[in-house]
Amino acid sequence: MALQRTHSLLLLLLLTLLGLGLVQPSYGQDGMYQRFLRQHVHPEETGGSDRYCNLMMQRRKMTLYHCKRFNTFIHEDIWNIRSICSTTNIQCKNGKMNCHEGVVKVTDCRDTGSSRAPNCRYRAIASTRRVVIACEGNPQVPVHFDG
């Protein structure tokens, strides 16, 4: 009897929190957010060297079967990146209106075209520049690097 009452109270609490927006169910954004983090976020480093790109592209599993042609690593705290999601919406390349722009430190890694997976070779360019990211969810989180 007490166990059934406990379950009922927990269910009521969960439904209340969902209604208040304090707990949000995941509708696939979590996996996309984790992929965004893996492919694009590296706050500890400033990057900038070819060696950095070669190592990070391999570590982040973007060279397993083919050499990813281009990738950008953002060298900012994840909270700074997430704050971009609160800027004005702009149109993404795919036409959706869930993109946002901000200025961050980055390393752009471009495939040299002279190597084969998994031993891909990259050229690095470090800069501080405008980026566009797509955000989804509640609260909004980055799920796609759009440029």
Swiss-Prot record:
What is the E.C. number?
A: 3.1.27.-
Disulfides per UniProt? 53-109, 67-120, 85-135, 92-99
Q: Kindly indicate where the leader peptide sits in this chain.
A: 1-28
Induction info reads:
Induced in response to insulin.
InterPro entries per the record? Answer: RNaseA (IPR001427), RNaseA-like_dom_sf (IPR036816), RNaseA_AS (IPR023411), RNaseA_domain (IPR023412)
- Protein name per the record: Ribonuclease 4
Report the protein's function.
Cleaves preferentially after uridine bases. Has antimicrobial activity against uropathogenic E.coli (UPEC). Probably contributes to urinary tract sterility.
Q: What keywords sit in the KW lines?
A: Antibiotic, Antimicrobial, Disulfide bond, Endonuclease, Hydrolase, Nuclease, Pyrrolidone carboxylic acid, Secreted, Signal
Recall the GO molecular function terms of this protein's record.
nucleic acid binding; ribonuclease A activity; RNA nuclease activity
* Catalytic class of the enzyme: hydrolase
